[in-house]
């Protein structure tokens, strides 16, 4: 489980594909791997991945973290588009006592969104995203959504998708500042919204 509060950005050092598995190696500042064990969960661009190896670099400023990503994950997320030098959002899983500053995020990506518009304003950035039609009903005005793992509040919603308003803090901490028109972003809809809508629809269908 995660909070949707991005801790830092990591840099992709290597991407290799072998027998349906993508080996992803990222470099991250050493404090973010403190007491990190093999098998631990880390959200990379909001996608929950399992740590398979950790290697500290010679200068001890950074560490390499290894993940194996399966085909199903690559098909549902934007991780397959990563390349050397890409920046990814990084969040370690919740531990006892962690402040829940965003909303509860599972790390299970539902779909990807395409960036349709980017409007840069004086103190923020507006971004319009489109998502597959079947997921649109779970994105509600002023509701929560996780974008590349970042817990954000939904702005206006229309037939074309929905808008985000990105404040300077979000732009500074996450990789959304580097997003461009046509890029795809990982989407996890709010689990409570998802459950309520599905429950109501199921009930109404049984009554019909």
Where are these regions (language model features)?
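Conserved loop->alpha-helix
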Residues: 1-208
């Amino acid at each position: 489980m995660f909070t949707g509060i991005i801790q830092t950005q990591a840099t992709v050092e290597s991407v290799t594909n072998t027998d349906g598995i993508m080996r992803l190696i990222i470099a991250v500042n050493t404090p973010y791997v403190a007491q990190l064990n093999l098998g631990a969960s880390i959200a990379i661009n909001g996608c929950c991945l399992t740590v398979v190896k950790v290697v500290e670099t010679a200068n001890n400023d950074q560490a390499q973290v290894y993940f194996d990503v399966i085909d199903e994950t690559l098909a549902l997320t934007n991780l397959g588009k990563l390349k050397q030098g890409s920046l990814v959002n990084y969040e370690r899983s919740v531990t006892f006592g962690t402040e829940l500053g965003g909303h509860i995020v599972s790390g299970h990506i539902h779909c990807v969104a395409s960036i349709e518009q980017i409007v840069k304003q004086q103190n923020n950035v507006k971004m319009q995203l489109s998502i597959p039609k079947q997921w649109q009903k779970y994105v509600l005005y002023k509701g929560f959504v996780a974008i590349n793992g970042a817990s954000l509040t939904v702005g206006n919603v229309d037939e074309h998708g929905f808008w985000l308003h990105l404040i300077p803090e979000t732009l500074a901490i996450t990789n959304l500042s580097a997003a461009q028109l046509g890029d795809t972003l990982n989407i996890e809809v709010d689990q409570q919204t998802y459950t309520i809508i599905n429950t109501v629809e199921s009930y109404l269908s049984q009554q019909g």
